[in-house]
């Protein structure tokens, strides 16, 4: 059985990506690891908020995949390097594909926060599927 790693950063992902990812996973007869990375650089006050939001996002996404009949597991990661955490997890779990939902960040935000998809693509030997923010979910 193939394994997919779907990296999510917000509840938007569960609304937008869960159904098409479930369809895709079924076509591939794949299980899905849903990963969220909480950064360690956040202040204590925001870190707990970020962790709670991440756990909620994971729960929403995995519940929707399971409801669609897909084997799914949520993984909460803590790292100051989001791309590296996603890649290391995909490698450790022997994933055959990494799926990323693009947020539609502008150039300035990517320069400040870093461009996780670009860093993953440059460093990954595992294929990466990018889902644009304005994607309608059609596969």
Task: Report each predicted region and the residues it spans.
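Intrinsically disordered or low-complexity boundary/linker segments at protein termini
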Residues: 1-16, 123-139
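Small/aliphatic-rich secondary-structure junction motif
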Residues: 2-51, 64, 68-70
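General small-molecule cofactor/ligand-binding pocket signal
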Residues: 33-35, 73-77, 129
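Short secondary-structure boundary segments
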Residues: 36-37, 101-103, 132-133
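Short, hinge-like loop/turn segments at secondary-structure boundaries
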Residues: 49-53, 91-93, 116-117
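Structural beta-alpha unit
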Residues: 66-98, 137-139
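Glycine-rich, Arg-bearing micro-motifs that act as flexible, cationic patches
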Residues: 101-123, 136-139
């Amino acid at each position: 059985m193939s394994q997919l790693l779907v990296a999510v950063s917000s509840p938007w992902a569960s609304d937008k990506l869960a159904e098409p990812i479930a369809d895709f996973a079924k076509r591939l007869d794949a299980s899905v690891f849903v990963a969220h990375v909480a950064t360690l650089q956040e202040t204590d006050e925001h870190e707990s908020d970020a962790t709670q939001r991440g756990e909620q996002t994971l729960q929403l996404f995995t519940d929707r995949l399971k409801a669609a009949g897909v084997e799914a597991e949520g993984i909460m990661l803590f790292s100051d390097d989001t791309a590296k955490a996603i890649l290391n997890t995909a490698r450790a779990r022997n994933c055959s594909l990494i799926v990323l939902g693009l947020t539609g960040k502008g150039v300035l935000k990517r320069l400040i926060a870093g461009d996780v998809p670009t860093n993953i693509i440059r460093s990954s030997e595992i294929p990466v599927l990018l889902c644009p923010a304005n994607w309608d979910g059609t596969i």
